[in-house]
UniProtKB/Swiss-Prot annotation:
Protein name, per record: Nuclear receptor 2C2-associated protein
UniProt organism field: Xenopus laevis
Taxonomic lineage from the root: Eukaryota, Metazoa, Chordata, Craniata, Vertebrata
Keyword Lipoprotein carried by entry: no
Cystine crosslinks: none
Compartment(s) where it occurs, according to its Swiss-Prot or TrEMBL record: Nucleus
């Protein structure tokens, strides 16, 4: 049975926040479990979310919920051990929908994980994520 590997000790970073308005659209809303909050990236063709775990974790699934029209057609998942260089784990291809989407891949031990959003469905390259979870 897979469970979330996110904890209070998980440190996250994002490529950008819409209009630098972290109080309304900041990274903290990726993980808060509330339906009405979200992370909104600023415009640009390459956006990402980076998570650093306090220790190595086994990961095998990503759960993402976008706002339709502000999703991504191609995502790359990269990970590494502490102080290592990120290496590609998998590519995955979300649908442009509001529904929660689940992506499975071979189990990896990582202390750092990055999801790169390579091409947004939004003309300006913005990404909106209401829910993100990492399971293993």
């Amino acid at each position: 049975m897979v469970t979330s590997v996110l904890s209070r000790g998980t440190v996250s970073r994002v490529s950008s926040v819409l209009n630098r308005d972290v109080k309304q659209f900041g990274k903290q809303f990726l993980f808060d479990g509330r339906e009405e909050t979200c992370w909104n990236s600023d415009q640009g063709s390459y956006q990402w979310v980076l998570m650093e775990f306090p220790q190595n974790v086994l990961v095998s699934q990503i759960h993402l919920q976008f706002q339709g029209g502000f999703s991504c057609q191609t995502c790359t998942l990269e990970g590494c051990q502490k102080d290592g260089e990120l290496v590609k784990i998998a590519d995955f291809y979300p649908e442009d929908t509001n529904a929660l989407q689940k992506f499975a891949f071979s189990e990896q031990s990582v202390s750092k994980l990055r999801i790169s959003f390579l091409n947004s469905t939004d003309f300006f390259g913005r990404i909106t994520v209401y829910h993100l979870d990492v399971l293993g």
